[in-house]
Amino acid sequence: MSQNEGAKFWLQVLTELKNRGVQDLFIACVDGLPGFEEAITSIYPQAQVQLCIVHMVRNSLKYVTYKDRKAVAADLKAIYRAATIEEAEQHLANFAQTWDEKYAPISRAWHQQWERVTPFFAYPPEIRKVIYTTNAIESLNSSIRKIIKTRRAFPSDEAALNQFAI
């Protein structure tokens, strides 16, 4: 799917949500799908967009040797688990100082995405855990795929919904 096709698709999805009554999005956590962020801000201009931290970490660890993975992951965790954005910035600087000789693309990516990585710092720690990752929706989608894969067909919409206890 090209960037333009992705944007069109997400624009249609979000327009349908708005037409069905979703008048406002407060914050949206995205995983970097092409066109998604632009579609969100087009339909919901006041929405904050948060880049998924889990996806940032996974993408960062692609550069890392197996031997260094635990240490690099721990240093990245210090960034997103910081109490304040200022503390997170300091942890990112420490990360760069420690790892840039071996893994400069990691800190470069975090610096480039910083404005999209940090919106969740405006919220209390209890809320941050919910909004900094797309894991909740990915888990739901996985459950839906599993049920659909085993059943393949449903006699009615109600029968399908009953599978999900809705």
Can you say where each PLM-predicted feature lies in the sequence?
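A generic short alpha-helical patch detector that favors 3-5-residue windows
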Residues: 2-6, 28, 49-52, 64-68, ...
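Conserved beta-strand -> loop -> alpha-helix junction used to position metal-binding or nucleic-acid-contacting
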Residues: 27-34, 39-75
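RNase H-like nuclease fold core
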Residues: 1-30, 34, 38-46, 136
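A detector of single, family-specific signature residues
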Residues: 4, 10, 18-19, 41, ...
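Short coil/turn residues that cap or connect secondary-structure elements
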Residues: 21, 25, 32, 44, ...
